[in-house]
């Protein structure tokens, strides 16, 4: 297997692409809303409630997603999150009622809420502290990319097919991404694409950080977190 120089930056690009898909998926509903209303009766109140449902599940998962990823690991955990939100996105294209749309939106929020914690975990595993700001910037730039490409792409799909296909196609993009992810992602030291010098560089840098900042595991209650002003 041919090694790829500075493979960690390819990983940053890959999670940036996942973030772009994340934001593309969530833009489907507001952009396609006028077309959806030709099929499903959605009042302004209904639409506001649907958005609130999404934000509730998204915000909840955003808060606890990191813990779930710590348990599952970045490779499996991130893949599960993206499969979840991709299937939820496809579900939007299959519903025929406001209730179904609200359920699909709730499920989408659960999956997408784990996206940022997953990306952050990957960066912490592959990048020394001095490179993390740039790595965070690369994956976070995906949010802007997704938001920019969403309007013309969704409009084109609607023009060629219909609004249901905007959800189905963007959901399938996420599933294709997961296939690539599972083929290439492991921890740096087990990666078949990473050069020995890069493995040594990452390992040495991360170990130096741990040695310089030794920590002890302490259980922290949720209540104490909510009382901490820095959390807010």
Located regions from the model:
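Cytoplasmic helix-loop-helix junction between adjacent transmembrane helices
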Residues: 104-143
């Amino acid at each position: 297997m041919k090694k790829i120089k500075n493979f960690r930056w390819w990983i940053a690009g890959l999670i940036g692409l996942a973030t772009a898909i994340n934001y593309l998926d969530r833009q489907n509903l507001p952009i396609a809303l006028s077309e959806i209303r030709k099929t499903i009766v959605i009042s302004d109140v209904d639409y506001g409630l649907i958005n609130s449902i999404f934000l509730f599940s998204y915000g909840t998962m955003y808060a606890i997603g990191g813990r779930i990823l710590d348990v599952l690991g970045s490779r499996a955990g991130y893949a599960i999150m993206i499969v979840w939100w991709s299937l939820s996105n496809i579900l939007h294209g299959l519903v025929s009622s406001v209730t179904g749309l609200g359920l699909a939106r709730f499920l989408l929020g659960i999956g997408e809420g784990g996206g940022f914690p997953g990306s952050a975990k990957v960066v912490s595993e592959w990048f020394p502290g001095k490179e993390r700001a740039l790595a965070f910037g690369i994956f976070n730039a995906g949010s802007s990319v997704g938001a920019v490409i969403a309007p013309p792409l969704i409009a084109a799909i609607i023009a060629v097919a219909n609004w249901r296909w905007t959800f189905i196609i963007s959901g399938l993009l996420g599933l294709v991404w997961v296939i690539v992810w599972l083929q290439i992602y492991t921890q740096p030291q087990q990666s078949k694409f990473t050069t020995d010098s890069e493995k040594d560089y990452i390992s040495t840098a991360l170990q130096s950080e741990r040695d310089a900042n030794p920590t002890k595991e302490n259980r922290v209650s949720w209540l104490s977190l909510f009382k901490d002003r820095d959390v807010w």
